[in-house]
């Protein structure tokens, strides 16, 4: 049997041994409820707040801007629902091809009076500079002292206020990295709540919350070798956010429930490890990804690399083999010992085409034949060569 090669690190990563040790230690020694006032509770609270401070420092935030959640999906839902229920309804502006955690949350708000408007992207999946101008007909430079940005309603010609905007920082399917500052700047100037989905970015590229200028930012530990079941939302100090869960005062009343101390400590440990080695890790991931990409294009020169090859995560390769079926490729690669995916694991089982590729204008023969390979630090160059050989063999067989 061929040895397995795991190339699905954007779906999840294996926790580092040091992270597992940290979680195990605090499960045993920091087991008390951090809300309790006795010595054991105070000790657990100390660990929780120390983890919060470490995470805040690494991500360019203040400790009281960190809200612990169960992961990135909950964090984005908390931001979007919390913002929507804290203000008068209007329009939510979102980039085409957002993660399901964002898209479905936004869609669920439509029955409550919210409308959606798409920010267009170019053929590489990057936000179009003129897209903001097309969404806001008056154009960013002519907004003057308007209280809100406005768009045309889906139902009539009356302008509707854009009150929330959301953008994905690094795309989970293509790895494309957005330049978000133009959007966050105009949102900040006109009082629009701006959320960033940074789940794929944190732990792969440098993320500084204050410098990005957003209102909120979501992240999840299992994407950067931390434990599953923990993530966070960075929320700008002073922002009103309505909770959508009830029953406790934890996380400043925004996320009730007994805090997961051991998991928070594990997440902080994973981020600390990334911080110490971030430059070496970025170089290593790029080397692995580029080796695999070169091997595949050498064997399949007609293949199409999706997204920007300049502005993308160092570990991500989304590639199409036009004329073939992505599902067939995926199944056959699994039989060949290659673990990869078609795109977002949160959308697995959906018959719909990858929204990110459709938004980029990819034709059906491309988006139906696309596969995502995401390398990790545990991979080797020898594995990349082996994987390219196996993948090339599968593609040749499927082409007949």
Annotate each language-model stretch with its function.
Residues 1-400:
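Pyridoxal 5′-phosphate
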């Amino acid at each position: 049997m061929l040895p397995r090669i795991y190339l699905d690190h954007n779906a999840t990563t294996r926790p580092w041994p040091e992270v597992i040790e940290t979680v195990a230690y605090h499960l045993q020694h920091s087991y008390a409820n951090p809300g309790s006032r006795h010595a054991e509770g105070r000790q657990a609270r100390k660990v929780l707040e120390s983890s919060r401070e470490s995470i805040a420092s690494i991500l360019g935030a203040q400790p009281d801007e960190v809200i612990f959640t169960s992961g990135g999906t909950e964090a984005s839902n908390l931001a979007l629902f919390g913002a929507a229920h804290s203000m008068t309804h209007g329009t939510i502006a979102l980039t085409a091809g957002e993660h399901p955690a964002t898209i479905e949350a936004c869609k669920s708000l439509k029955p409550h009076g919210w409308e959606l408007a798409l920010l267009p992207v170019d053929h590489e999946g990057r936000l179009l500079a003129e897209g903001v101008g097309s969404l806001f007909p008056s154009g960013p430079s002519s907004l003057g002292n308007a209280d809100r940005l406005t768009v045309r309603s889906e139902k009539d010609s009356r302008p509707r206020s854009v009150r929330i905007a959301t953008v994905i920082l690094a795309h989970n399917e293509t790895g494309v990295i957005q330049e978000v500052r133009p959007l966050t700047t105009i949102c900040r100037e006109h009082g629009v709540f701006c959320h960033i989905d940074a789940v794929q970015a944190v732990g792969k590229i440098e993320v500084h919350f204050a410098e990005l200028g957003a209102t909120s930012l979501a992240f999840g530990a299992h994407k950067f070798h931390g434990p599953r079941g923990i993530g966070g939302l960075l929320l700008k100090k002073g922002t009103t956010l309505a909770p959508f869960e009830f029953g406790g005062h934890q996380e400043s009343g925004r996320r009730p429930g007994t805090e997961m101390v051991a998991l928070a400590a594990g997440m902080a440990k994973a981020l600390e490890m990334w911080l110490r080695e971030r430059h070496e890790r970025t170089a290593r991931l790029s080397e692995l990804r580029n080796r695999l990409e070169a091997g595949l294009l050498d064997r399949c020169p007609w293949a199409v690399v999706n997204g920007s090859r300049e502005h993308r995560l160092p570990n991500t390769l989304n590639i199409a083999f036009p004329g073939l079926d992505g599902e067939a490729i995926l199944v056959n690669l699994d039989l060949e010992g290659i673990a990869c995916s078609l795109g977002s694991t949160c959308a697995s089982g959906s018959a719909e085409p990858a929204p990110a590729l459709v938004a980029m204008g990819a034709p059906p023969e491309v988006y139906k034949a696309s596969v995502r390979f995401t390398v990790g630090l545990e991979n080797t160059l020898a594995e990349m060569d082996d994987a390219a050989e196996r993948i090339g063999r599968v593609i040749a067989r499927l082409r007949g």
